Amino acid sequence: MMKNKNLCKILYYTDRDALDRPALTEKQCAALMGKNIKIIPKLYVDSSVLAYVIISMDNFAPSTNPQFKDNIISFDIICHFDQWQLKDFQLRPYRIAAEIDSMFDNQHLTGIGELHFMGASQIILNDEFGGLTLLYQAIHGGEDKKNAPNPADNKKIVDDFNELHNQSFIPLDTFISNE
């Protein structure tokens, strides 16, 4: 998310012309994480921060890949109502949603799965903050198994070892005479 220059500008600048403002430095983009972009679903309202994206995972379910579970990833986009309006009749939370959707819809993220847009709904927190929730289904397939240990591989190694060991093994009783 930090590599999306438009998203960083919309979150960082509170002006209507946020997209026309200079690109953020790497340090400024990195500072958005934890301040504007959160993975802990607790919102501390900061008077200097007026746009937030809260990322959470929920509704875990079994998948075809036993290493991972399918789940729903939600992006809660919260903006101060005074900051909703951007230039050209664009609305800040909807523009943030468009940037997020362009990055995640139908994309495969290693260890998370393939994301599919499920829908969006408006959220109103209070008389000052509101926005949207975007929902994506994360589906884990076999491609995420590539680097995961496979018990069947271990069985083949054990079988090969036993076969080799048993071929070179001469039972002790062949050396003992029963006379």
Where in this protein do the model-derived segments appear?
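Broad gene-expression machinery/nucleic-acid interaction feature
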Residues: 50-52, 70-74, 131-135
